[in-house]
Swiss-Prot record:
Pfam families, sorted: DUF1190 (PF06693)
Region (Disordered): 105-129, 149-234
InterPro entries tied to this protein: Biofilm_formation_YgiB
Biased composition (Polar residues): 150-175
Annotated family: Belongs to the UPF0441 family.
Organism (species): Photorhabdus laumondii subsp. laumondii (strain DSM 15139 / CIP 105565 / TT01) (Photorhabdus luminescens subsp. laumondii)
Biased composition (Low complexity): 110-127, 188-205, 216-234
Official protein name in the record: UPF0441 protein plu3956
């Protein structure tokens, strides 16, 4: 039996398919580069300072912007910092000499109960139209732009040994940005870290902010662990 070879094989089609196969890995690699670039653009480098003087020392030619960013962070802290009905509740969370009294903002509710047994003090604070909030321990500042103002966000820290925020820089949502140390330092954060935070509209119970810090820390560890696993496996 004789096997006949066909003369109708389209060699160009085979060569084209082979070229496409060889180009596929290249296309995937290029796509990966673009995806990595997109991820990089979603992060930005920020600086953490305790006060405007630290910023000015690190950026002598931009002292005015340092002060402006600091003052803007103070204003933001008044709106977004956790609020407490009593001084005792605030001190329990943040420590002695770490709290200040602030006028109640429009729309700030007072229905959230406190675990403090000093109900009379709570009623007096609510009647006086003021609440207690932690002092701003530092601020996070975006990149300084020539002639413009840098974005900033307030940071808080606790001196209470029982608080998850003890010795840490945390924002108003409870997210931690590492040790609250002097001298200034830089780090890379998601751009969402510099986005405006929602204004505080209710008082919180004693220990409530600490719970938020603990939850945020757990989420950060999980995200970091997941990222590492993908990098190793990928």
């Amino acid at each position: 039996m004789t096997i006949k070879r066909t003369k109708d094989i389209n060699h160009d089609t085979f060569r084209k398919a082979w070229r496409n196969y060889r180009l596929a890995p290249v296309a995937i690699a290029v796509s990966a580069v673009f995806m990595l670039s997109a991820c990089e653009k979603s992060d930005e480098t920020v600086s953490l300072y305790m006060n405007a003087d630290e910023c000015s020392q690190a950026n002598p030619s931009q002292s005015e912007q340092c002060t402006t960013a600091y003052n803007n962070a103070l204003k933001e802290a008044e709106k977004t910092a956790p609020k407490y009905a009593t001084k005792e509740d605030c001190i329990a969370e943040f420590g002695e000499a770490q709290c200040t009294q602030t006028p109640a903002q429009a729309g700030l509710g007072t229905t959230t109960s406190s675990t403090s047994t000093n109900g009379e003090a709570q009623a007096q604070q609510q009647q006086s139209g003021s609440f207690w909030m932690p002092l701003m321990a530092g601020y996070m500042m975006g990149r300084l732009m020539g002639g413009g103002s840098a974005p900033s966000q307030p940071l808080f820290s606790s001196k209470s040994a029982t608080s998850p925020a003890n010795g840490q820089f945390v924002d108003s949502t409870g997210k931690s940005y590492g040790p609250a140390t002097a001298g200034g330092r830089s780090m890379t954060v998601p751009k969402t870290a510099m986005a405006p935070k929602p204004a505080t509209t209710t008082t919180i119970t004693r220990g409530g902010f600490g719970d938020s810090v603990a939850k945020q820390s757990t989420m950060q560890r999980s995200a970091s662990s997941g990222s590492t696993s993908r990098s190793v496996g990928g």
